[in-house]
């Protein structure tokens, strides 16, 4: 008699199911953490696409200089010819020889033998590139962008979302140590003095011959050095701001009123109103820890300020290289301006030791795409934690910055930050002299075997104790004086009392603390 074998139950043991579930969760976690790094260098996973060496080299091709303040209409371009390079090399060697007599003289170039040269303006830079999936505006024409920033272009919420695209672009490989060092050297190149010779061409109106010959070089303007790779059709714009006495690493030890006005306007909470002893750089201060927000925005947008000047320089570069990929870089103030420029036009920007530029980015109403993941941004801030300017701690009445008249009160950066922990690794103490560009290059960027990892900044709020009102008259107009009548028994009396009530209440604030929605 045949017996039917009992069917086996196809059920896994609880231990088996637990192992499968654990492995699945671990795979999902690994995928989640690897996704930003994957997307940050593009959609391709091949090593060749992630890290590509440029076929050509970057050489200095032209220099722009733009006035600020009373000279803000002045804008010139110099083509870097062999004659200019030769004259610059002679001046560099002469300046270097003279600087050897002073122990505290800031070096004009790195002391590293790998990058040694007798003429920084004839140096050829090698940069590695990487693909980057970047979210930026579809329409990036300067005229459209300016109308968008100034609120002259009306669009619905759907139209505003549709104007952002995911764009595959070429960006500098910020994970490559040599590329980071080369970009820092390009930033330092903008500090090296140029002989006041050459065929300067007026970009805007004719140059005023009564202006001093050293305009734009030593104290009263912004300079942009243009490096070009003819093979890859890539431009690197290195930005330098004005010199700053007392702030090391800012080039010449000279200063102007325009320098402090613009620095204090960009990086202070309210017109450099540190205390009653300070002279403010604008008239937006209302009263104790209260500031006119609309006034600040207008001051930053003025044509004689830094931001407008650097936008004009970018327009000149764009006209010169209309089809090229453009990257921007800079150190300190130049790095902050590079970041603002990159934010405005959707350009990859690499900044070194720059002050926090999130606050001026918001005040200028620069484009921030909705729901933007940090790994889809093209802005990187390199710095170390022994630099109080970069870390946002160079403030307060007794700080080094305050003692020389600078209100560096911002600490928050946009994009990603790439911080070297020199305090723990090298035993450095926080000191303003650690801000110097060549100290950063020689002892930090070249002092580590790898470039610092770039991560999303920690949650940060600038000027948390300040109140920013829509306008100077808003606070007084929001209070009403009303008359009320009260009746008492058995006799009826009438009295008039003044009651102060608020006509509106803030029911919604953005993450910077500004009120965005009011309720009556």
From Swiss-Prot:
It is a single-pass type II membrane protein. GO terms for biological process: multivesicular body membrane disassembly; neutral lipid catabolic process; phosphatidylserine catabolic process; piecemeal microautophagy of the nucleus. The chain crosses the membrane at residues 15-35. It is found in: Endosome, Multivesicular body membrane; Prevacuolar compartment membrane. Lipase which is essential for lysis of subvacuolar cytoplasm to vacuole targeted bodies and intravacuolar autophagic bodies. Involved in the lysis of intravacuolar multivesicular body (MVB) vesicles. The intravacuolar membrane disintegration by ATG15 is critical to life span extension. PANTHER family: LIPASE ATG15-RELATED. This is Putative lipase ATG15. The lineage of its organism: Eukaryota, Fungi, Dikarya, Ascomycota, Saccharomycotina.
């Amino acid at each position: 008699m045949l017996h039917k074998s009992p069917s086996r139950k196809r059920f896994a043991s609880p231990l088996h199911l637990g192992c499968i579930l654990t492995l699945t969760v671990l795979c999902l976690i690994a995928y989640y953490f690897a996704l930003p790094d994957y997307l940050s260098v593009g959609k391709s996973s091949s090593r060749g696409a992630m890290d590509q060496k440029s076929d050509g080299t970057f050489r200095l091709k032209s220099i722009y200089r733009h006035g600020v303040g009373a000279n803000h209409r002045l804008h010139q371009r110099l083509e870097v010819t062999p004659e200019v390079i030769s004259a610059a090399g002679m001046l560099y060697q002469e300046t270097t020889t003279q600087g050897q007599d002073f122990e505290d003289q800031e070096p004009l170039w790195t002391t590293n033998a790998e990058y040694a040269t007798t003429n920084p303006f004839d140096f050829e830079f090698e940069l590695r590139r990487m693909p980057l999936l970047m979210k930026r505006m579809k329409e990036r024409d300067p005229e459209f962008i300016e109308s968008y920033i100034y609120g002259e272009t009306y669009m619905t919420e759907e139209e505003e979302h549709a104007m952002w695209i995911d764009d595959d672009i070429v960006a500098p490989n910020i994970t490559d140590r040599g590329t980071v060092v080369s970009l820092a050297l390009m930033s330092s190149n903008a500090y090296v003095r140029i002989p006041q010779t050459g065929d300067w061409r007026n970009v805007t109106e004719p140059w005023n011959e009564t202006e001093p010959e050293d305009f734009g070089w030593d104290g009263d303007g912004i300079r942009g050095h243009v490096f070009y790779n003819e093979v890859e059709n890539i431009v690197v714009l290195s930005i330098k701001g004005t010199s700053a006495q007392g702030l090391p690493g800012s080039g010449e030890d000279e200063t102007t009123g325009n320098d402090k006005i613009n620095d204090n306007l960009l990086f202070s909470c309210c017109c450099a109103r540190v205390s009653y002893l300070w002279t403010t750089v604008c008239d937006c201060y209302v009263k104790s820890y209260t500031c006119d927000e609309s006034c600040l925005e207008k001051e930053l947008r003025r044509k004689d300020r830094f931001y407008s000047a650097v936008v004009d320089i970018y327009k000149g570069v764009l006209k010169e290289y209309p089809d090229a990929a453009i990257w921007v870089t800079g150190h300190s103030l130049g790095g902050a301006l590079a970041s603002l420029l990159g934010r405005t036009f959707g350009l990859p920007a690499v900044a070194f030791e720059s002050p926090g530029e999130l606050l001026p980015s918001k005040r200028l109403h620069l484009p921030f795409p909705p729901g933007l993941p940090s790994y889809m941004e093209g802005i990187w801030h390199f710095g170390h934690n022994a630099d109080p300017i970069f870390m946002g701690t160079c403030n307060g009445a007794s700080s080094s910055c305050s003692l020389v008249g600078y209100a560096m009160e911002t600490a928050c950066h946009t994009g990603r930050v790439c911080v070297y922990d020199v305090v723990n690794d090298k035993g450095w103490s926080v000191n303003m002299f650690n801000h110097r560009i060549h100290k950063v290059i020689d002892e930090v960027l070249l002092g580590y075997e790898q470039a610092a990892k770039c991560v999303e900044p920690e949650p940060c709020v600038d000027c948390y104790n300040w109140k920013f009102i829509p306008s100077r008259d808003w606070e007084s107009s929001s209070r009403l004086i009303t008359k009320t009548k009260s009746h008492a028994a058995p006799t009826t009396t009438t009295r008039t009392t003044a009651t102060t009530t608020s006509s509106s209440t803030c029911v919604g604030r953005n993450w910077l603390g500004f009120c965005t929605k009011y309720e009556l």
